[in-house]
Amino acid sequence: VENLAVGDPVWTLDAGLQPIRWIAQRSVTLADQQRDARLCRVVFEPGALGPGVPAQRLAVSRQHRIWCGDWRAGLYFGQPEVLVAAKDLVNGGLVHVAPPQAAVTYVHFLLDGHQIVSSNGALTESFFPAALSLGAVDGAAREELFTLFPDLATLRLAFPKTARPVLRGREARLVA
């Protein structure tokens, strides 16, 4: 993800290749992480989500959502595919919170709609411009995003919903 740029095509589960419309990075210092543990990454070790998934270690923000396709999701929620925040999948083993590190850079990219993309072989979400996620983007990047997508400033962008239903903490534990 560190080498992606605006215009680069990204594979999506539902719409094939889609161009990146906007991309930004936010760096979090060691001091930031020590002050606020919520800024530490959630790490998925290889195989944490199933055989070979992810293929390599995957580190994401706590709120980044992971695709879960499981019979339990269908049984409990009537949807065979759901999105779950990384923090709700932490199990202290193959999915754990990383300790504060010298520097962590989060990369966000926006497509024409909310999509499911591949991250080290795991299915995760593209950036979803909602009030909570916009707070994760620094001021200059947020202004750039509002310039490119003016409706975002009032949260009226044509992203009517997420790519899959989103489970909350208690719900997520049923499929984790």
Feature names for model-found ranges:
Residues 1, 85-86, 167-168:
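General structural signal for secondary-structure boundaries
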Residues 9-141:
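Long beta-strand-rich cores associated with HINT superfamily self-processing modules
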Residues 2-9:
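Structural motif
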Residues 21, 127-176:
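Non-catalytic peripheral regions of nucleotide-handling enzymes
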